[in-house]
C-alpha cells in the first residue's frame, strides 16, 4: 500500500509518499524559517497561511518524483497533533479532502510517534525493544518502546524542553532565529570550560529533566556582562554558547544512559530536532561504548518535522494492524495538546 503523508504541525510543510513494502518513495519539505526570522519566533497565523500556499505544490512534487498518480495512493495520513491548532488544521483538511475525493481511509498520526519511529527509516534499522530519547523544541522525553503503539514513559521535562533551552538561551545571547542551530554553530568557536553552568537534575536519580534553571543561569551571565553599559563580546558569546550546549548535552546523555541501565536495554534511538546536534551525537557515541550499546539516529534531513515520518508511522501502524482502513465519514478533529500515552495499542 502507498500512503501519502502530510505534516503541518508548526513551521514546516512536509509531504511524503511511503510504501508499506518498499519504504520511503519521495518526500518534499518547505521550511518557514526565513518568514519568521524578523519576528524572532513562529507566528501561528503566518504559519497557517504559508501551509495553505505550499501543501498542494509539494504534493504534486512528491507524486512526480515517486512516479505516482493519485490513483496509486491507498491511504492518506496527517499529523493530528500536538502542535499549533491552525497549522494542524491545514494538513488535516487537505488530507481529509483528498481521502474523501478518492474514497480512501485517512489516518491521523501523533506527531511524536512520527519522530519516535523516524530512525527506523535509516539502515541499520533498530530492533524493538529500545529506549527512545525524544528531544525537540517542545518536548523532551525518555520512552521505552516495545513495538509500534507500545510506549512507556520513563521520564520527561518538568519545565522547558531541551530545544526550548537552546532557543531561549540563544535569544538571551542575541543570536538569530532559529536559535538552537545558531547557538550550536557559534559553540564550535567557543571554550565551554570558561563558564561554569549548572546541570539541572543531573544527579537526581530519576529520568526527568529540568532546563529552566540553566536558562536562568545564562541570563545571569548575560546581565553580568552587560551591566553598566558593557556588552557581551564575540568570544564571550561563543564561550557561553559552548558552555550552554555542553550542559544540555551532558544532561541528555546522562539521563539516556541511566534509562538504558534501568531497563537493561542496549539500543538507544534519538529523535527530534535536537537529535541533529553534532555534539550530542558524538557524546552519546563515546558514552555508549562501555555499555556495549548502540545509538540510532534518523538521517539529518529527517530530524526536523517532515512528512516522511508521518507517512512512515502510518505505514508501520498499517503493518501492525493498528490503523483503521475503513473509509469513514471524514469528520475529524486535531489535538493541539495530546499525550503520547493516549495512542497505546490495546
UniProtKB/Swiss-Prot annotation:
One example of a Gene Ontology biological process annotation: tRNA threonylcarbamoyladenosine modification
EC numbers on record: 2.3.1.234
Cofactor binding mode and count: Binds 1 Fe(2+) ion per subunit.
Gene3D superfamilies: 3.30.420.40
Location of the protein in the cell: Cytoplasm
SUPFAM superfamilies hit by this protein: Actin-like ATPase domain (SSF53067)
Enzyme class: transferase
Keyword Acyltransferase attached: yes
Binding site for Fe cation: 111, 115, 305
Primary localization: cytoplasm
Cofactor dependence: Fe(2+)
Keywords: Acyltransferase, Cytoplasm, Iron, Metal-binding, Transferase, tRNA processing
GO cellular component labels: cytoplasm
Domain of life where this protein originates: Bacteria
Binding site for substrate: 134-138, 167, 180, 277
Gene Ontology molecular function, alphabetical: iron ion binding; N(6)-L-threonylcarbamoyladenine synthase activity
InterPro entries for this protein: ATPase_NBD, Gcp-like_dom, KAE1/TsaD, TsaD
Substrates-to-products reaction catalysed: L-threonylcarbamoyladenylate + adenosine(37) in tRNA = N(6)-L-threonylcarbamoyladenosine(37) in tRNA + AMP + H(+)
Role this protein plays: Required for the formation of a threonylcarbamoyl group on adenosine at position 37 (t(6)A37) in tRNAs that read codons beginning with adenine. Is involved in the transfer of the threonylcarbamoyl moiety of threonylcarbamoyl-AMP (TC-AMP) to the N6 group of A37, together with TsaE and TsaB. TsaD likely plays a direct catalytic role in this reaction.
PANTHER family given in the database record: TRNA N6-ADENOSINE THREONYLCARBAMOYLTRANSFERASE (PTHR11735), TRNA N6-ADENOSINE THREONYLCARBAMOYLTRANSFERASE, MITOCHONDRIAL (PTHR11735:SF6)
Protein family membership: Belongs to the KAE1 / TsaD family.
Protein's UniProt name: tRNA N6-adenosine threonylcarbamoyltransferase
Source organism of this protein record: Bordetella parapertussis (strain 12822 / ATCC BAA-587 / NCTC 13253)
Lineage: Bacteria, Pseudomonadati, Pseudomonadota, Betaproteobacteria, Burkholderiales
Amino acid at each position: 500500500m502507498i500512503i501519502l503523508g502530510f505534516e503541518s504541525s508548526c513551521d514546516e510543510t512536509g509531504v511524503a509518499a511511503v510504501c508499506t513494502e518498499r519504504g520511503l518513495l519521495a518526500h518534499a519539505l518547505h521550511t518557514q524559517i526565513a518568514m519568521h526570522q524578523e519576528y524572532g519566533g513562529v507566528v501561528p497565523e503566518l504559519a497557517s497561511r504559508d501551509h495553505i500556499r505550499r501543501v498542494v505544490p509539494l504534493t504534486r512534487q512528491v507524486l512526480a518524483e515517486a512516479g505516482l498518480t493519485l490513483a496509486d495512493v491507498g491511504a492518506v495520513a496527517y499529523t493530528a497533533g500536538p502542535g499549533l491548532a491552525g497549522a494542524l488544521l491545514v494538513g488535516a483538511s487537505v488530507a481529509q479532502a483528498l481521502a474523501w475525493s478518492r474514497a480512501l481511509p485517512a489516518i491521523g498520526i501523533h506527531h511524536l510517534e512520527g519522530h519516535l519511529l523516524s530512525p527506523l527509516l535509516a539502515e541499520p534499522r533498530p530492533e524493538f525493544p529500545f529506549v527512545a530519547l525524544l528531544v525537540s523544541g517542545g518536548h523532551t522525553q525518555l520512552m521505552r518502546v516495545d513495538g509500534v503503539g507500545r510506549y512507556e514513559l520513563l521520564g520527561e521535562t518538568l519545565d522547558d524542553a531541551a530545544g526550548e533551552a537552546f532557543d531561549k538561551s540563544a535569544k538571551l545571547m542575541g543570536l538569530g532565529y532559529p536559535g538552537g542551530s545558531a547557538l550550536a554553530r557559534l559553540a564550535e568557536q567557543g571554550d565551554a570550560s570558561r563558564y561554569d553552568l549548572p546541570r539541572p537534575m543531573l544527579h537526581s536519580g530519576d529520568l526527568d529533566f529540568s532546563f529552566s534553571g540553566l536558562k536562568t543561569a545564562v541570563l545571569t551571565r548575560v546581565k553580568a556582562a552587560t551591566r553598566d553599559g558593557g556588552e557581551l563580546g564575540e568570544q564571550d558569546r561563543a564561550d557561553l554558547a559552548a558552555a550552554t550546549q555542553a550542559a544540555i548535552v551532558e544532561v541528555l546523555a546522562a539521563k539516556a544512559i541511566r534509562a538504558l541501565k534501568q531497563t537493561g536495554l542496549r539500543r538507544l534511538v534519538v529523535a527530534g530536532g535536537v537529535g541533529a546536534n553534532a555534539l550530542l551525537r558524538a557524546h552519546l557515541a563515546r558514552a555508549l561504548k562501555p555499555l556495549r550499546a548502540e545509538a540510532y539516529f534518523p538521517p539529518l534531513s529527517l530530524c526536523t518535522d517532515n512528512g516522511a515520518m508521518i507517512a512512515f508511522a502510518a505505514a508501520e501502524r498499517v503493518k501492525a494492524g493498528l490503523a483503521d482502513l475503513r473509509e469513514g465519514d471524514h469528520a475529524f478533529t486535531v489535538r493541539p495538546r495530546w499525550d503520547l500515552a493516549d495512542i497505546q495499542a490495546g
